[in-house]
Amino acid sequence: MLLPKRVKYRRQHRPKTTGRSKGGNYVTFGEFGLQATTTSWITSRQIESARIAMTRYMKRGGKVWIKIFPHTPYTKKPLEVRMGAGKGAVEGWIAVVKPGRILFEVAGVSEEVAREALRLASHKLPVKTKFVKREELGGETNES
């Protein structure tokens, strides 16, 4: 699973989940990508589950790029504990995904294989997504 090697502060405030993604909106490394159309937190376990689903379908052919990283810790207090008495312990790590963000990129396989692999990965994620292709001049074309 993905998590930072070290952080300056162990616990953080919850991140903002409004607006569109500022960066990472174009397919840059691969030929095809999976683009988010809604906002959500994605945990490191969900990212790993989506990666496994893609690589198994592609039978280890081609290359996969994970374009998001769970930098932000989220905390949780134990069950049946009263309010107060400090912030809870770190439960896991999340990546905040906003609309327009490319989550995964794939190269080295046909479009049909890439489309199905990214569809399987999208079922593991809590965001709505769409399949995008890379253009020659650096951008991407939006295809549903």
Swiss-Prot record:
One annotated GO molecular function: structural constituent of ribosome
GO cellular component terms listed in the entry, alphabetical order: cytosolic large ribosomal subunit
Record-linked InterPro entries: Ribosomal_uL16, Ribosomal_uL16_bact-type, Ribosomal_uL16_CS, Ribosomal_uL16_dom, Ribosomal_uL16_sf
Swiss-Prot/TrEMBL keywords: Ribonucleoprotein, Ribosomal protein, RNA-binding, rRNA-binding, tRNA-binding
Region (Disordered): 1-23
Amino acid composition bias (Basic residues), ranges on this chain: 1-19
Source organism, top-level taxon: Bacteria
Pfam families xrefs: Ribosomal_L16
GO annotation, biological process: translation
Database matches in SUPFAM superfamilies: Ribosomal protein L16p/L10e (SSF54686)
PANTHER family per the UniProt record, alphabetical: 50S/60S RIBOSOMAL PROTEIN L16, LARGE RIBOSOMAL SUBUNIT PROTEIN UL16M
Similarity-based family: Belongs to the universal ribosomal protein uL16 family.
Stored NCBIfam families: rplP_bact
Function: Binds 23S rRNA and is also seen to make contacts with the A and possibly P site tRNAs.
Subunit-level organization: Part of the 50S ribosomal subunit.
Protein name (database record): Large ribosomal subunit protein uL16
Species this protein is from: Staphylococcus aureus (strain NCTC 8325 / PS 47)
Upper classification of the organism: Bacteria, Bacillati, Bacillota, Bacilli, Bacillales
